[in-house]
Amino acid sequence: VELEWCALMSSSFEKETGIKVNMVRKSTGEVLAQLNAEKANPKTDVWFGGTGDPHLQAAEQDLTLPLQSPQTPKLQDWAQGLARASGNKATAVYLGPLGLAYNPEVLAKKKLAPPKCWKDLAKPEYKGEIQNSNPNSSGTAYTGIVTFVQLFGEDAAFDYMKAVHR
């Protein structure tokens, strides 16, 4: 989630309620680990942002509480779906695409064609050129793995990721 969004929400909430907000930006994995660590003595009031799967994990582990908002029926169907799937312990606030990004200048210098699809990344010419975040801490990187499993099937997805890693 963009820092600007968080700053605006924090300042607006403080202005409206008089309650001081201590906003901390962390990766999805860090927040989930923190909620697990705090389970016996919770310190976190609101978890805003992150990808859907960790929110569902937190809901299943009773790390979050249900909130039946009267605004839920006004949300997009996909956001309402996450609320239902989590027992109203999570609500989707944004939908972000997962895509490839590359530096055309670097590709031109190395005489590489731009990748056109995920499977292109496993080609030998891209060896050593691919970067990705750690899916243990990055919700987006984790979503990438889930996406590959959905696209290719589980075994083929992990074979693909091994090929990219080589």
Locate the predicted segments by residue.
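Extracytoplasmic ligand-binding site segments that recognize negatively charged/polar headgroups
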Residues: 2-7, 26-30, 42-166
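Short alpha-helix C-terminal cap/hinge motif
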Residues: 8-22
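A short local structural element in Rossmann-fold oxidoreductases
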Residues: 10, 36, 59
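Short, well-structured alpha-helical segments in soluble
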Residues: 33-40
